[in-house]
């Protein structure tokens, strides 16, 4: 190609190719992870080879594998935030129909994006501390957003803030468990998929029904007795 032609090429074409290479590296890391490797066990050379680029191209996008992992967390969770935002909007008052539709929609999304959710589930307890912290931060974000929504609707609007946050945490961890169960499914197991989905729906119903009957004054946990203090037992 003529050098002058290259110089006249619109800059957006170069940017587009750069974005394509970056995405190829992210997809390569997800694929290698699915083949059984955690992020900490995958080398950047393996990622570059899987993406079809030379290793030096990796450094044009990421300093190291930790930075690639952080980009993956951002990329996956950015898409997930929109799904959860829509679910929160429809389930603000936790009607039964909204719980069912939200769970079924989430199940479909997980099964359509298994590699991404396998990455989040695996790296939540992975060896890379920066990535592990990023996943934990996203989980706290989802829980905090849900708590903010719940606070504006009864019965949660009358509950102490800590209790609302506890309900949100229960919901988020139920969804995390649902995700892990779905990822263990093999292909062609519709009955098991239905069982997992139905159980999650029932668990969320129980959480919201229980929260509606919650009395904060009855749920107080007394502090531990000071060392040497009488236990009150005979």
Predicted regions and their residues:
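Amphipathic C-terminal alpha-helical segment
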Residues: 109, 148, 168-190, 204-219
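Hydrophobic alpha-helical connector segments
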Residues: 85-115, 171, 197
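N-terminal intrinsically disordered/low-complexity leader segments
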Residues: 1-20, 158, 215-234
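Amphipathic alpha-helical packing segments from all-alpha helical-bundle domains
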Residues: 129-155, 165-180, 198, 202
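Amphipathic alpha-helical segments used for helix-helix packing
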Residues: 112-130, 147, 180-184
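Alpha-helical DNA-contacting segments of helix-turn-helix folds
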Residues: 66-79, 83, 120, 134-135, ...
